Design a protein with these regions (language model features):
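Glycine/Thr-rich phosphate-binding loops that ligate phosphate moieties of nucleotide
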Residues: 1-176
Length: 176
């Protein structure tokens, strides 16, 4: 659970060089390598369960940063902050890792499953409760804003990605 993984990961200040690439079904944006596989790198005799759990949370955060970087590269738009909801938004270690990996503030939704809130906003606009989607979404306020407090090693992340890629060459060569 988000709570349990936070408790475990919070026992150490960092992952001690352990990296996890969450490519359990290959890698999507921006890598598009269906033959990539989940990879755990940098384990030593001193690696603890807490280091591995923190590395998993940081790996997921790095994938989020990959997607933000892809959006910025494709659109040339500046992404000033990230808004998140869902179960992982209740994991302080993950939220901080996401802020650190993206180098952006992360705004945590007060509603854990905000998909329903978005549907409510659209319904409200459809029945003229709000005159526009901007008016509706202006009513949303984050429950918390988390700022980056250190930089995660994106160069080491890119090295980990390169090691996870092309694990199954026949799948890696697929192009859609």
């Amino acid at each position: 659970s988000p709570e349990d993984s936070h408790k475990i990961a919070a026992q150490v200040p960092d992952s001690a060089g352990v990296m996890f690439v969450p490519a359990l079904f290959g890698l999507g944006t921006p890598h598009w390598d269906y033959g990539a596989r989940g990879t755990l790198l940098g384990i030593t005799r001193g690696t603890s369960r807490s280091h591995v759990v923190r590395a998993v949370l940081e790996g997921i955060a790095h994938r989020g940063a990959d997607m933000v970087d892809a959006v910025v590269a494709a659109t040339q738009l500046e992404v000033e902050s990230i808004r998140i909801d869902g179960g992982m938004s209740r994991n302080p270690t993950f939220v901080q890792a996401l802020a650190n990996a993206t180098r952006r503030n992360v705004e945590v939704s007060p509603v854990t499953e905000a998909t329903t809130l978005g549907a409510a906003f659209l319904a409200g606009v459809a029945v003229s409760f709000w005159p526009s989607i901007n008016e509706a979404t202006n009513t949303w306020k984050p429950s918390q804003i988390v700022s980056p407090d250190k930089e995660l090693d994106r160069a080491q992340w890119h090295e980990a990605i390169s090691r996870a890629r092309n694990w199954i060459p026949a799948l890696s060569s697929l192009d859609f």
